[in-house]
Amino acid sequence: MMKLSLLLGLVSFSAVLASENRRGNCQMCPEGTRYFEKNNLLGRRFKNDVRKLCGDGMSSDVHDESSSHSSSSSDCKPRRRRHHRRYEDSCSFGSSDCDDSSTYSSCVSSECSPPCRPVPLNCDYELKTPIINMGERIFEFLKNYEDQYKKAVVLFLTRILSQIDGFAPSYPSADYEPLIEQLETLGVTVPSNMAADLAALDAAEATSLAGTIRANAQKVIGDLLARVNTMCYLDLMSLVTSGLFASQVTSAFSNTQPIITIAGNDLFTKQMAVFQRLPGTLPSAAITAITNALQANKNNFVTFFTTQTTNLQTDVQNALTALITALTTLTSTTSTEFTQFANSEIGALTGRIFGSSGSGSGGSSGGSSGSGSDGSGSGGSSGGSSGSGSDGSGSGGSSGGSSGSGSDGSGSGGSSGGSSGSGSDGSGSGGSSGGSSGSGSGGESGGSSS
């Protein structure tokens, strides 16, 4: 029977060796290790052979039993360590696992155990991770608001530029035929193309003036738009709320009136030069008629462009007012929404870190007084406390009083108390009361209940 058992043991041992011939490390040969432990084959003298069978690749000489007792614990430590600095292999073991007083089987058992979950080396990440995530969500919220704010300003300036680009009013030229007829009546020879030349001067001066107004406004608004595109939110908000933004927008049309006046004077001068080229000397009546007609045309020219630029400036001012109102509404609404959003984020973090909250209250009061030859006094105290938490709640109170009067003295006292508690693991209540009174020689009584 013993021979049969030995034979079966050898067969099982050979099967284990054949099935476990490919090993990456001891953690891949739990079956073989359990076999060694079960059959008491893990003596210290066989430790190197066992590690070789496990595929550890350890090439150390087999020492005798006496030398194995003096071996250090470094023989049992894994050869490869994790290189991730943030984590430490919780399955690794120190020298206490493999000292001289321990058996090698416990060391191999530790090595061949299933891999454990890495433990964070720095627990600060329990705080850093939720805080970083919360910060990113808050950043996205505020960044979205800042983008909306800036886009509104940029869109406003872009639309203003489009309006300015389309500023090209066509001045209706005056009717010069009555003036030419009047000059001919006064004996002045007038070329047939005189009226056309005067109308051409009107159109040319109108085009030039519109271009000048347009170029000046484009430069002011374009420069402002370029600055806004490079501004951060705080600078842009300061520019808008301070009123500088509105003043810069309106300055695009602030110098148009002098330009219009100068253009009207130039038109008058150019048209007068046309009549001065006529042959001969003009009679004074003809000069007066020409001057009056050209002066009226100049006034009409100035009035026309003043009206056109005023209309454009009014449109821009209305759009500017709408922009300021929209930005104010956006800021107020987003501020309220952000307060709610931030409170919810902080509340979630508070619940994560602190969990359930507790509250407690307590109070005591007392008083004493005395009177009489020997004295009489009374005193009392009362107190109560209560608490609640995730694991239980309790309350208790006590009150007592004593008084005495008389030459010899008489007194009475009493105390009562109660406590109760309830929690997830149990509940209980109890109370006691007692009192005593004496007069003359003395008296005593008491009672308790629970």
Curated annotation (Swiss-Prot):
UniProt region (Disordered), positions on chain: 58-80, 357-450
Compartment(s): Spore, Perispore
This protein's record includes keyword Signal: yes
Top-level division of the source organism's lineage: Eukaryota
Chain segments annotated as coiled-coil in the UniProt record: none
Residue windows of the Sequence repeats: 358-374, 375-391, 392-408, 409-425, 426-442
Keywords in alphabetical order: Repeat, Signal, Sporulation
A GO BP entry: sporulation resulting in formation of a cellular spore
Name under which the protein is recorded: Spore wall protein 1
Native species: Encephalitozoon cuniculi (strain GB-M1)
